């Protein structure tokens, strides 16, 4: 078994190397610019097969993401060793409210919609302002960072009665980390829930003629019901419907890009634009219009879709609904890879439609939101009706994340005060003040607060991966699978902390030296802590 796991691991590395080599040798070739129906640039090809480098890269990226699940995902599964004989929290602690066995497909959809939000769309579109290097980060980060983070954090929660992230961090990083993470996670989750109500409301208002405040109240009303009712009552029934909008959005954009090189062979009624997919393949230069440093800012901008600490706050929700431990990889790892594919498609779509990061930067400059760029892409490629369907998908993603966030916040508060949540009155005791705070916060200006959302997100991911490293070290298993991405993300958040003008404002070089030294110290401390923990940490449920 160990030999097969090792071979699968090196096979995954080989795939990554091939992917990197093809990216390096792909030549940069651009076509002439035409005006799309909305006046945005669309790149014409001299013929249907005149330049297939970008098209091949696009297909290859999606295939590598899928292959990463079936190869590296199996390696992670062998490292963790799921046990079919162990009872899961849903079976051992069933209460009909939060601990409920649900079909795997339904749990997968809820997990996907809970973690996705606007990150794999807005974050991916804004991330490609740094150039095609963003596509490399999505693929490599999703497989070797995001899937590791989501699978292990979800499975550790599963082994500990569906514990929330603060309890997991406290168990492996210490009691101080537990209390700090409780405060951070609760505040962080409330902010995410509020923004994922205000954001969709701002999109829906001009589409319907209703005011933004009216939509905020409607969305909060749905959030409240989804937070207090049994998980299968609303989320278990509504999410399959939400997933239809998500599928239409992804399949629509993906279909246009796959058929674009063959547009002249397509029926007229399909309205497939003739364009060059990914005309700009300059992977190794920072292209950001404002000259923001690619490292670390790009790795903070693209969080969801690559690796995101926010996911670890959501996984315990579904860890309480799995029937067997074998369902962990398709639910936690599979949802992460699916989100990575969504992010990759939207990042590639933005580069294809606008042609260059500079053109995309002009379209999103002067306060123009990425939602405008997304609407232009969808309307140009899919027409007015298709644009509406895509924008509905864009609205559904944050709403389906916001309800899960606030439900998890209720559970985290319940864990803090040891409040049993079987009775409705106990749930209302937490939910009413929680939503009162959320409504009060919804009127605040997020222009400054949201700048640090991505940084806090990656800080949470780094802490989670260090906790996973300690867990694996305590079991004498391959802790490097988590320690390496933990070290990288720690370097990202520390470099941003030291070098960002909004934070410490040190010189880039001095910040990098300090960050590397601190990461080395953190890594040594975590590995020593892991070797000192006893192995018998997982009670039979």
Regions found by a protein language model. Give the residues of each.
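Extracellular loop-to-transmembrane helix junctions
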Residues: 53-73, 127-157, 166, 511-519
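Helix-loop-helix module between adjacent transmembrane segments
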Residues: 64-65, 69, 111, 145-161, ...
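Loop-to-transmembrane helix boundary motifs in multi-pass membrane proteins
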Residues: 175-179, 186, 216, 334-343, ...
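Membrane-interface "cap" regions at the ends of multi-pass membrane proteins
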Residues: 64-121, 327
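Helix-loop-helix connectors at the membrane interface of multi-pass transporters/channels
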Residues: 162-176, 199-215, 315-340, 373-376, ...
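Extracellular/periplasmic helix-exit of transmembrane alpha-helices
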Residues: 258-280, 334-376
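Membrane-helix boundary/coupling elements in multi-pass transport proteins
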Residues: 119-125, 161, 188-201, 300-322, ...
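Hydrophobic alpha-helical segments and their helix-loop junctions in multi-pass secondary transporters
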Residues: 193-217, 225-227, 246-284, 469-479, ...
